[in-house]
């Protein structure tokens, strides 16, 4: 069952959530079909094949062991830290990413070598501590969505004009 979790002052629904039992059923079905996998505090390792990964509140020790290069979507939730060394691993090992969502993570910079994500279509830096975008963002030729809401980015590099699909 879908439940309303937040309503604005005019009575419009702003956020919904799934009932816990339904959420667990959906997560198990996604895992069984190898469609998506959620790596959480309860599950500190993952072996197998999946194209979509959700990382929910795991420690850095888990993140640094994580090397599934076939992943196309990577979503982060409830992380206390996102070390620069993990970012280097991410940029080196996950070349097939199409979706990267850092919303609400403690991310404070985007490395210059971000241009290695040729297939990246969606990048969310919403509510992060990122202050500037690297000039290499102009090399993300397939980028269609760049979410900078509630981020600290105040200047956008001129190279962003090269992104025809944005």
Give the location of each predicted region:
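Surface-exposed helical/coil interface segments that assemble multiprotein signaling complexes
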Residues: 1-117, 122, 138, 158-165
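Acidic, glycine-rich calcium-binding repeat modules characteristic of RTX/beta-roll
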Residues: 143-157, 166
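Leucine-rich repeat
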Residues: 108, 130-131, 153-154
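A detector of tandem-repeat and repeat-rich interaction/domain scaffolds
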Residues: 131, 137-146
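Alpha-helical and His/Cys-centered functional microenvironments
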Residues: 23, 127-130
């Amino acid at each position: 069952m879908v439940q309303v979790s937040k309503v604005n002052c005019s009575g419009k629904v702003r956020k919904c959530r799934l009932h816990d039992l339904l959420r667990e059923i959906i997560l198990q079905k996604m895992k069984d079909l190898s469609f998506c996998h959620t790596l959480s505090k309860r599950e500190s390792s993952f072996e197998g094949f999946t194209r979509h990964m959700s990382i929910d509140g795991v420690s850095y020790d888990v993140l640094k062991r994580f090397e599934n290069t076939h992943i196309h979507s990577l979503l982060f939730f409830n992380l206390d830290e996102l070390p620069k060394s993990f970012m280097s691993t991410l940029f080196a090992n996950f070349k097939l990413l199409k979706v990267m969502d850092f919303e609400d993570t403690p991310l404070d910079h985007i490395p210059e070598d971000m241009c290695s994500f040729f297939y990246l279509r969606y990048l969310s830096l919403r509510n992060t501590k990122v202050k500037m975008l690297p000039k290499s963002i102009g090399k993300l030729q397939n980028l269609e969505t760049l979410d900078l809401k509630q981020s600290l980015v105040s200047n956008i590099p001129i190279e962003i004009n090269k992104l025809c699909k944005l």
